[in-house]
């Protein structure tokens, strides 16, 4: 059977068997790290004298048959096989066991060393070299860098029977300044969309002093391997937007030495925004060192997939990238900004039969991330009275009187509360209705509207991504065909009070199919919907958008699930506008959509206050009869029997018997026990009483603080749905029962729950 080598991993490294097509060599080196493999292949090619070398990625050797084939065709003919295994034996257990067996049968030397800082005794037992030799090999890679890997090649050649000069490994710093990616601000911070760095008219010294500051952090391993082109490209993009940039490499954000250096840098440099390319979560009880800047932390990904795989995928991020660069960093309160690079073959290294793979910058996404950083830094530096904000309300479902509907939130009163909050914080907010019903009536009846002329819309629409506009035209036709177009313009009902505009989110599709299309991941938005966001960004020139309540439609529009691209609808419409999203705390799954697809900062708000459900009249009658039965059971057994019959009659009449699976054939004691248990559960159940007003209740101050901190370009503490922190008992009391479980309880026994409980629905 002949197996073809695959060009590169796809979106997810699948485990199909492959033949790498390599020929035997005296030394074989295997690793999960493309950067490490590429650097070693480059160094070997610089002096391709004997012994020969083969480099291969362990990611290509996941299938057992691939392992068997590689050992048979390449490894068993070698004199020395070195494996650098990230994650311990469990990540490549079959390969470790088979290589260990082959080494002892065929007589080649085997060294399997950890791919990180953590030792694994199982790897040492599988190896055939001495502990000293294994420790030396591990140190070459742990210290890293070209000089140490050059010494490794010399030491490996010596072990393989060709004495070669080598030096003991020299430790490299665990953290440091990456000079190649540091930039001094030479011009002023350009205004949005400005291309001329000198447009402000300030002196160069004043411009440099007033320039925003960005701190970029990335992994030491990329610096040691010289594989940080995306970081340099990002620094250039930030610098073009007026930033002073400091870039630092770190072994880990949790390492004490790295923490110390970053803490000192943050204190001296005082960044307005941080762009972090390290993965996983770095948060401890005391938070992360990056929190000390009290600035937004944009999480960026150096993706492990190829650009082609990403471009052709609806998911966007593969499993590893999603976990490492998206999901886990959310725990630290980072704002996911997207991928800035993808893996690419840069050149073929014939001497080691290895195709060099490095991180290739993705220009469109680097520009998007730089714009996002600029706008968050702008929020941080602008005075509150200068900021232009939009407060957008959901408009679901399609029933009159439900405009601005959000799960668990009293939207009209929350609008008033947020207006008051912003006004008290010195935002330029005019007077607003004091009655929430009047607010909603003004929006629903279009008492005031703004418009985007068709000609202006067509001009802006022509600047959007071609793939996106093709989808829109295919679904909805030309802009002139949109029913919302009136008198040559798209009109939007809104309330303008100073520098705050309040509006209902337009329909993303046809009004009659709102419920069906609300979460449609395939249907492109209609022209009127697009026009609304273009008006906010280009005509209104908002600095930030607040979307109030769970939930809107922007984050559900077509596009990739994570790591969006320039044609994905949420990125096309929102652009690099900071999105702040008050979201109910007990729905983190849907909050994740906004975080991952719209770079939202979610501000968790509490569920409605909880009250006891209570019992309906028939249920109260049964409860009273059960009390009577309990008293009679010991004092008057004959009366107890009659009471029990009455209880069962009432239970049958009310439907409770069926709910508790009680029939006339059920043992009487068992039947009464079931009825009693059910009544106790329902009576003690707590359900929502009314709706929550943003900024009110036990966590109200934290909710308000979270919103104001986000709008000020400061760091927002993470939590459920981006929730404000509260003491555990309060959170337990307030969010003990999710809306889903309450709905399920209502479905189980609607007749037996009191009218007051039903009204709370």
Regions found by a protein language model. Name each.
Residues 1-761:
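Ligand/cofactor-recognition surfaces for anionic moieties
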């Amino acid at each position: 059977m002949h197996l073809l080598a695959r060009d590169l991993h796809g979106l997810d490294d699948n485990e199909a068997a492959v033949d790498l097509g390599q020929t035997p060599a005296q030394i074989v080196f295997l690793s999960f790290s493309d950067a490490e493999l590429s650097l070693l292949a480059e160094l070997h090619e610089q002096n391709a004298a004997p012994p020969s070398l083969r480099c291969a990625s362990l990611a290509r050797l996941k299938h057992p048959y691939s392992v068997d084939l590689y050992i048979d065709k390449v490894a068993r003919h070698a004199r020395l096989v070195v494996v650098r295994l990230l994650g311990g034996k469990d990540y490549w257990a079959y390969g470790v066991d088979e290589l260990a067996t082959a080494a002892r049968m065929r007589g080649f030397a085997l060294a399997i060393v950890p791919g990180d800082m953590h030792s694994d005794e199982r790897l040492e037992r599988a190896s055939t070299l001495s502990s000293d030799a294994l420790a030396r090999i591990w140190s070459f890679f742990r210290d890293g860098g070209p000089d140490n890997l050059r010494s490794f090649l010399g030491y490996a050649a010596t072990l393989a029977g060709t004495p070669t000069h080598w030096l003991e490994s020299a430790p490299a710093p665990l953290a440091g300044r990456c000079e190649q990616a540091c930039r001094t601000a030479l011009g002023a911070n350009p205004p949005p969309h400005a291309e001329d760095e000198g447009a402000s008219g300030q002196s160069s010294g004043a411009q440099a002093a007033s320039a925003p500051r960005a701190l970029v952090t990335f992994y030491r391993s990329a610096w040691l391997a010289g594989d940080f082109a995306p970081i340099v490209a990002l620094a250039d993009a930030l610098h073009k937007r007026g930033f002073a940039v400091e870039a630092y490499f770190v072994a880990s954000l949790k390492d004490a030495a790295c923490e110390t250096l970053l803490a000192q840098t943050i204190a001296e440099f005082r960044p307005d925004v941080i762009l972090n390319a390290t993965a996983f979560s770095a948060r401890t009880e005391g938070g992360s060192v990056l929190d000390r800047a009290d600035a937004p932390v944009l999480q960026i990904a150096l993706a492990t997939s190829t650009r082609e795989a990403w471009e052709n995928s609806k998911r966007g991020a593969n499993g590893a990238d999603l976990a490492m660069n998206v999901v886990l960093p959310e725990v630290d309160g980072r704002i996911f900004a997207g991928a800035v690079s993808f893996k690419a073959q840069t050149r073929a290294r014939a001497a080691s039969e290895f195709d060099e793979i490095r991180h290739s910058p993705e220009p469109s996404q680097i520009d998007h991330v730089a714009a996002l950083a600029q706008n968050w830094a702008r929020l941080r530096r602008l005075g509150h009275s200068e900021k232009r904000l939009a407060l957008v309300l959901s408009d679901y479902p399609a029933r009159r009187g439900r405009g601005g509907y959000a799960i668990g939130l009293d939207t009209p009163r929350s609008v008033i509360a947020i207006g008051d909050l912003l006004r008290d914080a010195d935002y330029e907010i005019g007077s607003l209705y004091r009655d929430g019903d009047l607010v909603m009536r003004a929006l629903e009846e279009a008492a005031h509207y703004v418009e985007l002329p068709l000609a202006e819309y067509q001009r802006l629409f022509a600047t959007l991504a071609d793939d996106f506009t093709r989808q829109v035209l295919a679904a909805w036709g030309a802009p002139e065909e949109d029913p919302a177009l009136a008198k040559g313009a798209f009109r939007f009902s809104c309330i303008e009070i100073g520098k705050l505009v309040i509006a209902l989110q337009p329909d993303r599709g046809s009004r009659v199919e709102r419920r069906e299309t609300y979460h449609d991941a395939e249907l492109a938005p209609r022209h009127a919907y697009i026009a609304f966001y273009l008006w906010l960004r280009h005509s209104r020139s908002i600095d930030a958008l607040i979307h109030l309540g769970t939930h809107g439609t922007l984050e559900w529009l077509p596009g990739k699930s994570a790591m969006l691209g320039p044609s994905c609808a949420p990125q096309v419409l929102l652009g690099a506008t900071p999105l702040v999203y008050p979201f109910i705390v007990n729905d983190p799954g849907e909050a994740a959509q906004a975080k991952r697809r719209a770079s939202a900062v979610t501000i968790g708000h509490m569920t409605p206050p909880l009250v006891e459900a209570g019992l309906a009249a028939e249920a109260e009658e049964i409860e009273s009869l059960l009390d009577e039965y309990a008293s009679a059971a010991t004092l008057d057994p004959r009366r107890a029997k009659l009471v029990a019959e009455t209880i069962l009659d009432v239970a049958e009449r009310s439907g409770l018997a069926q709910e508790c699976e009680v029939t006339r054939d059920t043992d009487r004691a068992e039947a009464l026990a079931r009825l009693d248990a059910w009544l106790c559960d329902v009576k003690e159940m707590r359900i929502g009483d009314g709706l929550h007003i943003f900024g009110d209740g036990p966590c109200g101050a934290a909710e308000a603080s979270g919103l104001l901190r986000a709008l000020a370009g400061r760091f927002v503490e993470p939590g459920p749905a981006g929730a404000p922190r509260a003491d555990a008992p309060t959170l337990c009391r307030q969010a003990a029962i999710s809306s889903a479980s309450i709905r399920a309880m209502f479905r189980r026994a609607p007749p037996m729950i009191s009218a007051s409980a039903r009204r709370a629905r």
